[in-house]
Amino acid sequence: MSTRPAFATAMKTILLDVGGTFIKCSDGREIPIDSDGSREDIANSLKEALADAQKAAVAIPGPFDYEHGIFLMKHKFAAVYGECFAEIIGGNREYRFIHDVNAMLLGEMASGAGKAYERVALVTLGTGLGFSMSLEGHLLMNELGSPLVPVYTLPFGDGILEDYVSKRGFLRGYQGLTVKELAQRAGEGDRAALERFADRGTILASCIAPILKEYGIQCLLFGGQISRSYFLMAKTVEEGLRNVDSLQYAGPVQDIGNATFNGLKTLL
């Protein structure tokens, strides 16, 4: 974790959760952003989100150089690849940057479901598949500040794990349906929908169990929008992790909507 000094609290600060289509702001605003857009479009959205704040703590997906604030993504924000966040925006603000999955994990360790544990892992289920771990209060990160052990690229089936356990994985074979709607079908007893959630739980557990065992994880949390339907896959997840002797708890984060902001607050 960064040892840089915390922000001075006298200056106006904003917390930003930057996604591929929206920027969620700690003041309640949601600013549209097109991660496939032009440099100008991306800059304008970021400027609107920052408004008149003098300091900002920013959660953003990787690859990204979190120490220096440099975009390194090619699949998103390609128009600003290699550029510095602060230079794109201009002005004289101060920034702290953190991987979005790391931010959520920090939030849950500070004031959520992970608070009582020393070895915590987080899986985020949404458009993509995220994974982060913390041991004794320290995030496990690579040299750029991204989670040390990415699981989305783990080989599985005819592709990678993210192909199966993410939005596109849950909706394989379904046209014009959202994961929320699929969950509603499952809640109404639709057998195929129930099996889809159960299968995704089995797949995920089988792939991450060796990692959880290796690091002695005690608490496994689930975040992201799909985790709102965790109860539909809880049984198969727990069955698949029954041989992880260190594991004491598995379940959704305490505050899906605010966990990332809670993590960003710890940077201030």
Give short role names for the model-derived ranges.
Residues 4-44, 70-72, 139-161:
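Short glycine-rich, Thr/Ser-proximal phosphate-binding strand/loop in the N-terminal lobe
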Residues 13-17, 55-57, 119-124, 130, ...:
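Short glycine-aspartate micro-motif
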Residues 21, 61-64, 126-130, 226-227:
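Short glycine-rich anion-binding loops that position phosphate/pyrophosphate groups of nucleotides
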Residues 264-268:
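Short, hydrophobic alpha-helical segments
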Residues 18-19, 99-101, 125:
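Fold-independent oxyanion-binding glycine-rich loops
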Residues 35, 39-44, 55-56, 62-119, ...:
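Glycine-rich phosphate-binding loop and adjoining helix at the ATP-binding site
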Residues 26-27, 39, 96, 111-199, ...:
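Glycine/GP-enriched mid-protein hinge/lid loop-to-helix segment characteristic of carbohydrate kinases
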Residues 31-54, 171-232, 249-260:
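Adenine-nucleotide phosphate-binding core of ATP-dependent small-molecule kinases
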